[in-house]
Swiss-Prot record:
UniProt xrefs under InterPro entries: Elong-fact-P_C (IPR015365), NA-bd_OB-fold (IPR012340), Rib_uL2_dom2 (IPR014722), Transl_elong_fac_P/YeiP (IPR020599), Transl_elong_KOW-like (IPR013185), Transl_elong_P/YeiP_cen (IPR001059), Transl_elong_P/YeiP_CS (IPR013852), Transl_elongation_fac_P (IPR011768)
One Pfam family it belongs to: Elong-fact-P_C
Disulfide bonds listed in the record: none
Cellular-component GO terms for this entry: cytoplasm
GO biological process: peptide biosynthetic process
Pathway in which this enzyme or protein is active: Protein biosynthesis; polypeptide chain elongation
Alphabetically ordered keywords of this record: Cytoplasm, Elongation factor, Protein biosynthesis
Protein name in the entry: Elongation factor P
Functional note: Involved in peptide bond synthesis. Stimulates efficient translation and peptide-bond synthesis on native or reconstituted 70S ribosomes in vitro. Probably functions indirectly by altering the affinity of the ribosome for aminoacyl-tRNA, thus increasing their reactivity as acceptors for peptidyl transferase.
GO molecular function, one term: translation elongation factor activity
Species of origin: Cereibacter sphaeroides (strain KD131 / KCTC 12085)
PROSITE patterns (UniProt xref): EFP
Gene: efp
Family classification: Belongs to the elongation factor P family.
Length: 188
């Protein structure tokens, strides 16, 4: 199915010259002079090579048809990451290349969307928000309330996020998986 380049989003799968690529990032640029362009960073599914492309925003790109289904994360071992389809209980092993940087979000039982093409896993869509626990934060400096001040914090999964001053070690927070930003204090 042909789509215009400006409509490409992270996780989309495109077909270029018979090869499939997963979109990692897509940004639209509108220079003051000249034609608007879409800068797309992609990963070739066959060998994991990262590629950068630049298209005019109105240019047509072939979007591949993929099967997308819900899976639950089970565990990780030397083979890869194991997921189970909750209805049929079919299990699938996904390579670390496909999981990518999202591995830090995976927790046992987490529901994700797994995209497949010809029964081969090509990309994973994680929930937009996940709950993590803070292991350590820097102390708050009194008197810095004139502007919104955030402080760095380390999470149990190894991520560093910026959090408001009232968040301390042991607090569970919700973060956005796309930009690793603090959303709110967990309500549990």
């Amino acid at each position: 199915m042909k789509v215009i380049a400006s409509s490409l989003r992270k996780g989309n799968v495109v077909d270029i010259d018979g090869r499939l690529y997963v979109v990692l990032t897509a940004q639209n640029f509108h220079p003051g002079k000249g034609t608007p362009v879409t800068q797309v960073d992609m990963r070739r599914i066959s060998d994991g090579t990262k590629v950068s492309e630049r298209w005019k925003t109105t240019e047509q790109v072939e979007r591949a048809t993929v099967d997308e289904r819900e899976y639950d994360f089970l565990y990780e071992d030397g083979e890869g990451y194991h997921f189970m389809e909750p209805v049929s209980y079919d299990q699938v092993v996904v390579s670390p290349d496909v999981v990518g940087d999202g591995k830090v979000f995976l927790t046992e039982g987490m529901r994700v969307y797994l995209q497949t093409h010809n029964d081969v896993a090509i990309s994973i869509e994680f929930p937009q928000k996940v709950t993590v626990e803070i292991t350590e934060t820097e102390p708050v400096v009194k008197g810095q309330t004139a502007s919104s001040s955030y402080k760095p914090a380390m999470c149990t999964n190894g991520l560093r996020v910026m959090v408001p001053p009232h968040i301390s070690a042991g607090t569970r927070i919700v973060i956005n998986t796309e930009d690793l930003s603090y959303v709110e204090r967990a309500k549990d």
